[in-house]
Design a protein with these regions (language model features):
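Sec-dependent N-terminal signal peptides
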Residues: 4-13
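Glycine/tyrosine- and acidic-biased, solvent-exposed loop/turn segments at the edges of beta-strands
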Residues: 14-112
């Protein structure tokens, strides 16, 4: 019984460290450019804020990144990097589409 309690305590305390995935987490990007170093702490005034799926401590799956100057990225992430989605400026104009981790289609037009 004592061993079972020790094992359960270990799993509960260290499960975020040993690489499981979570939906709806918040991370903050540290660094000046993509790809960021992702941390669970930050200030939305100085660090880009990510909300979405997280695996192994980095964005992986669907999520939203909001930069400190107002642009936003909505879409999928792969191993902490932007993968397939759309980047908008602070006014809601589409500025880039991302396809398999590369910026594409820099047509500027208003989204509705």
């Amino acid at each position: 019984m004592k061993l079972l309690l020790i094992i359960l305590s270990f799993l509960l305390l260290y499960s975020p460290v040993i690489g499981n995935s979570h939906k709806g987490e918040t991370l903050y990007g540290w660094g000046n450019t993509l790809p960021y170093v992702w941390k669970g702490v930050g200030d939305k005034e100085t660090h880009p804020k990510y909300e979405g799926d997280v695996e192994n401590g980095v964005p992986n799956g669907l999520g939203v990144l909001i930069s400190t100057n107002g642009w936003k990225y909505f879409g999928s992430w792969k191993n902490g990097e932007i993968w397939n989605g759309t980047e908008y400026d602070k006014d809601g104009n589409i500025i880039y589409r991302w396809v398999e981790g590369k910026r594409k289609y820099s047509n500027l037009y208003k989204s509705y």
